[in-house]
Amino acid sequence: CIYEWGIMKKHVYTYTLGTLYYFASQDSPELYKEYKSKQSSKFMEEAIDGSHNDIAKMLKAEHGCDFICASIESKIWFQFTGQTWEQMEGGVILRQKISNELSQRFTEMQCNIFKNMLDSENAQNEGEKAKWDKRSKQVQTLRRNLKSAPFKNNVMRECQDEFFDPRFKEKLDTNPYLIAFQNGVYDLEKNVFRKGRPEDFLSKKMNVNYREYDDDDEEVIEVHNFLEKIFPDKSLCKYFMDLASDVFVGGNYQKKVYFWLGSGDNGKSILQKLMELMLGKLAIKFDTSLITGKKP
């Protein structure tokens, strides 16, 4: 896979190696898990001595496409959750894998060691038995350490170096034509809805699922009726719907600011609330001083 990737010619696709890993995990989860396990197993022998760096390399080999350290000083971590990259406190989810996932891997290794010890004992091979006995004690010590807070702290410090991407935060949310829903990503340039990809570099998503609607669906008719009550003038109603559609494109390419004016009870607050519920974190309320105050 790595060799083929290296000799491939560049086309219009912007897929990264991380995305190919993600595609593989979606296409065949069990085979992908087996592949990643074999990748990380390369570092298991070195890790038996208890090196924090070797443990970190095991985690990198198995989870390098899912976690990023964006700042070593501030310990800022992100995890790809299927649609977006979500920030997590101190890399806590990766840290949990040390006590759970890696501990289980070394438990399985110790079971194999016990089998080899038994075989060498039955064969009355003292040299082999001593070798496996030493190995067993090393793994037993490591298993205890994997559940120790000070040991995990040191491993996470090494993970910061292994998973570090100094430009990661600069890449986030830079494509104005991608918008994340709860169940996928809509590409406004290609006019397609698809699964999220790591190289989308999205960190925010709307509060709603994407679904296809027909004009005669009950929900569509209800929204149209609501808008027609607020905007009886059909041309004004169409103008607002076109305007509202622009909110899905990042930035302000028209360089316009809109003010909703009018007396009370004319639907402004309800309309605003609907937009906020739909957009989630993408809807921001800022202080009026941003407009009325002096330039910074």
PLM features per residue range, with description:
Residues 1-6, 24, 102-105, 230, ...:
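Generic structural signal for hydrophobic core residues of well-folded globular domains
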Residues 2-42:
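Basic, alpha-helical nucleic-acid-binding regions used in initiation and control of genome expression
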Residues 67-90, 137, 171-173, 178, ...:
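P-loop NTPase catalytic core of nucleic-acid-dependent motor ATPases
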Residues 1-3, 18-22, 54-58, 154-160, ...:
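Short, hydrophobic/amphipathic alpha-helical patches that form generic packing surfaces
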Residues 11, 29-33, 65, 108-115, ...:
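Intrinsically disordered or highly flexible coil/loop and linker segments, enriched in small
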Residues 41-208, 212-214:
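Intein modules and their embedded homing endonuclease domains
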Residues 6-7, 161, 296:
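Short, conserved secondary-structure transition motifs
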